[in-house]
Amino acid sequence: MLDAFAKVVAQADARGEFLSNTQIDALSKMVKEGNQRLDIVNKVTSNASAIVTNSARALFAEQPQLIQPGGNAYTSRNMAACLRDMEIVLRYVSYAMLAGDSSVLDDRCLNGLRETYQALGTPGSSVAVAIQKMKDASVALANDTTGTPIGDCSSLVAELAGYFDRAAVSVV
């Protein structure tokens, strides 16, 4: 896993070049956004349990066949596995948001996930809906500035949404 800083340095080093002004400007912007990034990650992680639980409830309300006999989330064991997987995706999205880079999400969570779900007979489209619901909840939290002098963080909220979109696309 590389954060945005390590990635830029590694790329420049591989080319045997100094960092360009554009690269330095991008890293400076990331430093300036650091507190906002931390605030967003804190909001998501502090509410992770509610995000996962409420997203799962909404998914099962829309797709009740998942929790009926024969459904992929039927039995407490399968339900627990579903909630665990949702929590893992949310956790790695928060890591990517903190790092400002999707490589940790891709490498440690998403690579091979579609194949795993296919092998288990889990409908990827349902997983994508669950991820979308977690995205909606997380974006709402990130946009809620009540009690937090977070300022304009629309680009960071878009970045957060992008990590969820990346995860949703990877499972279908």
Swiss-Prot record:
It is found in: Plastid, Chloroplast thylakoid membrane. Keywords: Antenna complex, Bile pigment, Chloroplast, Chromophore, Electron transport, Membrane, Methylation, Photosynthesis, Phycobilisome, Plastid, Thylakoid, Transport. Contains two covalently linked bilin chromophores. The gene is rpcB. (2R,3E)-phycocyanobilin binds at C82. GO terms for cellular component: chloroplast thylakoid membrane; phycobilisome. It comes from Porphyridium purpureum (Red alga). Coiled coil: none annotated. This is R-phycocyanin-1 beta chain. It is a peripheral membrane protein.
